[in-house]
Every structure is written in structure tokens, then in C-alpha cells.
Design a protein with these regions (language model features):
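Conserved, single-site charged/polar hotspot
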Residues: 2-466
Length: 466
């Protein structure tokens, strides 16, 4: 979306709910268990939100950190390619890794299907049973080969597997005595399967349209990185949430169709279109999260005013804070003070805070030693919604706390510690609640989604790619 994949401990969703953050490892499948194999090597923890923080709201649901802003973003070079825009002659296909499995896989077809693999090809209808014997995939007992493609035919052809219905086809790869399951689906149907899980279908069309373009762009960016791999994305907040066709609505499909083929580019290439639930008043620059710069991910004013995500307050204690540091292997003994620049009004960057005020690092000084932790580490250890926060020892702050005052010194054993924070998610790219507010106030002219995107992504172009 958006740690994600770093905090990815929160990281995708993101970009939104704030309870998932991220990074998945490959685990071997057992019996009927479906496992998402790990994303290609990543250097950040799952904050998927943190994929670690992903939460769902009732009426207006957003995945707080989707896609996770994991270190995945660090794979991008500081210099953006200036190659000319390469458009597709037709809609591209996305490969979504649904999981891995060792037991028989039941597959139901909405219509007929062609089963293809190697030199084998036959028609099938109804319910199928997919198994693996050695390095051979079998469909209804017929050997197909090391790879089988189940391709539904007819308009609206779809299949159901693993409890979900999907557009497109199913690719099954025999692997280590089990099978790897990949949904091969047109990009537009993929985006339609992402949108209702990343943004409430009841939101204004301009917000849904902006999210659709972000989801499409994010997918294309990852497809470019996945050359030579079995798949492009997973259906989790490690990337962005995708659960097939069942939750599509007229509103979400309309937003996808209205923006069909529209993609955000920088230097002629699809951008890493991260998004998150709520920027908390100001989004962050990539350089302050990853240490390298992406010119289109700059901190900007966020228009969210949503209660519960724009600002939040946690009450804890010195004892609890010491215990959490100890449990994380970061014990400093009895806390004396926290070295951290007091939270100010954005934009205002300091050595330990980004332009939005998000914590880059904080030092905990104790009786035995001192430890410096990154904002993402603290978000994970303390279970925070974002890294835009400050500590207040024995002082209960108001949401509109006057900036600049420091309350970071511990004076007694029963010190009360308040943590005032803003936003939900990694803070990079599109703020979903900010998009909602802009769409609520903007014109319903079919073009306003572009203004939303141009606000949250700096210096981009929005092009028709197919």
C-alpha cells in the first residue's frame, strides 16, 4: 500500500487497518494447511502493518498498513530510471500466490475449463480434485505434468478454491511433494478483488478511484521486480489484501472501470505506490524511513480528521515500559530518561524525527545502560498505530498538546507514562482517510481522483498504460 515490510511489523495494508504489518516467511505446508510462501527475500520485519498491525474498522474499513512499507522499498534505487513509458498492448496478467498445500485440493468451476500442462490438454466441468504425485500434478486422476493450468472458459468464468472464488485461472506447480497455487488473473479483476478489502465501498468515488489507481500501480511495480519468479504478489498485507471476487460491489467495480489502465509513473516507470490508513496530519518522506530517497514519496500535509486514527492516547507505566523493553531484549534496567526531541508541528525535521515528526530513533537511558531504538522497533515493541508519537512522563497531554515541551524524565517507581500519537500505518504515500476527506469536499467530476493522487505522490504522471 504500506513496514510494513520494516515494521512490517505493523506492513500492506498497507495501508490501512493498522494491525497487520507484515513480512511472511515460507513455511512448509502440512496436511490441509494453506501457507503463503515467503515473499522474495526482504530485509524488514513484518509490520504489515507491521503486517503487525492490521485492523479493521466498522463502517469505514481500512487496512492500516497496507501494503507494508517493508524494506522492500529499499530495493529501489535512489536514481529513478528515465526510460520512456512502456505501455502494454493489452491488459497484463498478475500472478497471485494463494498458498501451498500437500493434501488434495478441491476446485469448483462456475462453468467449464481447459486443463493444460506440457503436451496434455483436456476439458473439465464441475468439481475437480487436484493432487500431486512426485513431481507430477494430477487433475481428477489424470497426470498433467509438473505444472497444470486450469483455465475457466466463457464470459465470467471463475473457480473456487481454498474457500474463495476467483476470476482468472489457477496454476498449480508441483514442488517438494506438495503444490504451489497461483491465481493468474487480469490486472483489472485483480484490482477489483483488492479494492473492497483496502477501502470501504461506501466511500466517495474519487477516493475509491484513487485507491484503485494506487493498487494497480503497486501491482505493476511488483510485477516488474518479479521477473523470473513463480509469482508477483501474495494476497496478504505483505503486498495488498486480495480475496477474489466475492466482495466486489457496484461502487468498487465502477471505480476500477472508470480508471481502467490508469497508472502512476515517475521517470517512465510505475511507482512503488505505498498507502496507509491515516497520515495523522502529515505524511513522511521515504528517506526518513528507509534511509534512501524516492522522489515521489515525500512528506506532505494530510487532510484526515477521522477520530480514532488521526490522534490516539495510550496510558501505561514505567514498570510496563521497562518490562516490554526487557521482553524485547532491550533492557536498560531502571529507566532514568528518554532522549528524544519533543514532538513539534510538521513540517519540522530533526536528527531523530522525520519531516512529519515520526520517530526515527529514541534512546532509553537506564541505571545499567542505554539503548537506542528505531521508531519502527518501538512501534512493534509497544504495539503502536504509527511512529508519529511522543512520551509524556507524569503529564497527561491533550490531543492539541502545545509542542516543544519535554516530559521524558522518570522520577519515581510508580511513574505514569502517556503516549500521544497520530495516524495509523507507516505514513508513506496515500493516506486513505486523507483521500476520504478530500473526496468528501471535492467535486464529483470523475477527475478529482487525480488531484488526490498528485497531492500524496510528488511529481508523478498519471498515464493510460493499456
Amino acid at each position: 500500500m504500506i513496514f510494513s515490510k520494516q515494521l512490517k511489523a505493523t506492513i500492506m495494508a498497507a495501508l490501512f487497518t493498522g494491525t497487520s504489518l507484515v513480512t511472511m516467511g515460507i513455511t512448509s505446508a502440512t496436511s490441509n494447511t494453506v501457507v503463503h510462501s515467503a515473499k522474495r527475500v526482504q530485509t524488514e520485519h513484518k509490520t504489515k502493518p507491521s503486517k503487525v498491525i492490521t485492523s479493521t474498522k466498522s463502517t469505514h474499513k481500512t487496512h492500516t498498513n497496507t501494503p507494508v512499507a517493508s524494506r522492500k522499498g529499499q530495493q529501489e534505487s535512489n536514481s529513478i530510471s528515465s526510460k520512456s513509458v512502456v505501455r502494454y498492448s493489452q491488459e497484463p496478467t498478475v500472478r497471485v500466490l494463494l498458498g501451498s498445500r500437500t493434501e488434495t485440493l478441491p476446485v469448483s468451476l462456475s462453468s467449464g475449463a481447459k486443463v493444460v500442462g506440457g503436451k496434455t490438454s483436456f476439458s473439465a466441468t464441475g468439481d475437480l480434485k487436484v493432487t500431486v504425485s512426485g513431481n507430477t500434478v494430477k487433475v481428477n486422476g489424470k497426470a498433467v505434468g509438473p505444472t497444470a493450468h486450469i483455465k475457466p472458459i466463457g464470459v465470467g468464468g471463475a473457480f473456487t478454491a481454498l474457500g474463495q472464488s476467483y476470476h482468472g485461472g489457477l496454476k498449480v506447480i508441483a514442488r517438494n511433494g506438495g503444490m504451489r497455487l497461483i491465481n493468474e488473473v487480469g490486472l483489472e479483476d485483480y484490482v477489483a478483488g483488492v479494492l473492497p478489502y483496502e477501502m470501504s465501498p461506501s466511500w466517495p468515488q474519487a477516493a475509491l478511484q484513487a485507491q484503485a489507481v494506487a493498487a494497480r500501480t503497486y501491482a505493476l511495480n511488483n510485477m516488474a521486480k518479479a521477473k523470473g519468479q513463480d509469482y508477483d504478489v501474495t494476497p496478504s498485507t505483505d503486498y495488498q489484501v486480495y480475496k477474489g471476487k466475492e466482495r466486489e460491489t457496484q461502487a468498487t467495480r465502477k471505480a476500477v472501470q472508470h480508471t481502467q489502465g490508469m497508472v502512476m509513473t515517475y521517470g517512465g516507470q510505475p511507482i512503488n505506490a505505498l498507502f496507509h490508513s491515516d497520515g495523522g496530519g502529515y505524511t513522511e518522506s521515504a528517506v526518513n524511513v528507509w534511509g534512501n530517497d524516492l522522489p515521489y514519496l515525500k512528506g506532505v500535509k494530510d487532510y484526515s480528521t477521522h477520530e480514532g486514527t488521526r490522534s490516539w492516547l495510550i496510558t501505561t507505566s514505567r514498570h510496563d515500559l521497562e518490562a516490554k523493553l526487557r521482553a524485547a531484549g532491550k533492557s536498560v534496567g531502571s529507566l532514568k530518561k528518554i532522549e528524544l526531541t519533543p514532538m513539534g508541528r510538521a513540517p519540522l525535521e530533526t536528527r531523530d524525527r522525520g519531516i512529519s515528526g515520526r520517530v526515527k530513533q529514541a534512546t532509553f537511558v537506564g541505571a545499567s545502560k542505554k539503548v537506542t531504538l528505531t521508531g519502527d522497533q518501538l512501534r512493534s515493541i509497544l504495539g503502536l498505530k504509527s511512529t508519529l508519537f511522543d512520551f509524556y512522563v507524569n503529564h497527561k497531554p491533550s490531543v492539541q498538546e502545545k509542542p516543544g515541551r519535554s516530559y521524558h524524565t522518570f522520577t519515581r517507581k510508580n511513574d505514569v507514562v502517556y503516549i500521544l500519537g497520530h495516524g495509523w500505518g507507516h505514513g508513506l504515500g496515500l493516506s486513505q482517510w486523507g483521500a476520504y476527506e478530500m473526496a468528501q469536499k471535492g467535486p464529483n467530476n470523475g477527475e478529482y481522483y487525480k488531484k488526490i493522487l498528485n497531492h500524496y505522490y510528488t511529481g508523478i504522471q498519471i498515464d493510460k498504460w493499456y
